[in-house]
Amino acid sequence: MVSLAPNNSAPVPEKRLVLWIILLILLGASMLLSLGIGRFSVSVSNVISILLGNILPIEPTWKPVEERVVELIRMPRILIAALAGAGLAVAGAALQGVFRNPLVGPQIIGVSSGAAFGGALAILVSESQVLLIGAAFGFGMLAMLVVYTISRQQGRASILMLVLSGIVTSAFFSALVSITKFVADPDDKLPAIVFWLMGSFASASYEKVLLIGVPVVSGALVVYFMRFQINILSLGDEEAQSLGLKVERTRWIVLVAVALISAAVVAAAGIVGWVGLVIPHFARLLTGANHNVLIPAAALIGAIYLIHVDNVARASIAAEIPVGIITALLGAPVFAYLLRRAANKGWTSE
């Protein structure tokens, strides 16, 4: 099993500063370039001029339609993609640390499937965005509770039981989603549910930026404030208890924060899978397993990753590809590789 406990491989402060600068530059450049990418292309110079025109008295040299595309269509979409990527990456890093398991993520342990059912049910009965995020959070938390309860053996959650419990729980909630689609109005509710479930930022707006931003930032801040406790949990329950940590309470605080993040992303963008599983591994390669550094690094990398995935989704072909399809195509092979590597190291023993 891959150790997720803090070690001495984390970068020294000077290298850490360089890492933050590089990631922040990449994030800013990614957002800037993405504002010009799409079926209606806008040059980088015009994008910069449009943005500066909001704060400086610049004579417009761009077309009004370019300004509308950049500020009203692409900007909220990119902000939502960045928030979703950062939130899911933070959630995945937190779950992997809490469970001492590099193979878990919001989708693997059933949170996404539970939130998907809650969201689909909310769409079926109402058009309220508040109900959508509330139902997604409630059922996402319920799914996590079921998985965690089933997977516990002799006072701990084993890797094998955790993955299997996640598969079972995901299958159950997927069946409930299928029932919801079966009874939905085929001319109204069904298309809305199906398109939403595939994951997309096409319906982005500044209202949705607020919808996803408040819970994602709140949940991510809770996780970050718990980073030292997650480091201790990564040592194991017995070691954590011997150091005076209240293991169950700490774990549940983190789990509630993760469920809030996942539910907000599902409510705003549908199912965007595999980000929370894959991105923490790449972040860990750069920072080591110390969550003091890992969590913010995962957030930045996740934001950059999902921004570029969305670029591919909306610019590769004439018809927009759902983001969830692309993340699954990229994430599933990585998960298969991780499973194989863990199996070779005797993953069933933990």
Task: Identify the function of each model-found stretch.
Residues V2-E350:
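Alpha-helical transmembrane segments in inner-membrane proteins
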